[in-house]
Amino acid sequence: MAISQAMCTSFKKEILEAKHNFLNSGGSTFKIPLYTSSASLGATTTAYTTSNEVTGTNYTAKGNSLTRVDPSTSGTTALTDFADTTWSSSTITARGALIFNEDASGDTSVLVLDFGADKSSSSGDFTIQFPTADSSNAIIRIA
């Protein structure tokens, strides 16, 4: 089993089908569940799964809802981002995460995050800090 960071192939197609709305006002609901190192997630992941999702204090299935940042452009690159998200006072060990669209039929996947190694919190904050929202670093970039 492995987690491979990737923009999900199904998401690329669904952009052209207008299944995802990243506008901050009135947009889709995006969630971010966390996964153990036993999860198998990558570019071929098409939807949220409970298989190998973490459990722990102050963690609920499907993870946190994400706060969207309106899409923008920089040069010829379109981009969007999310606000950092925190599971407060939690006890969690996770190797990666999946961003998915909860409003789309079937909880369709957007992208997979690989933390590179297990990350843990013990009665503390578990935070995912998203990169700078620019054409080189934003979590979702289309060049």
Language-model regions, residue ranges each:
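Small cysteine-rich, disulfide-bonded extracellular modules of the LU/uPAR three-finger superfamily
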Residues: 1-95, 102-143
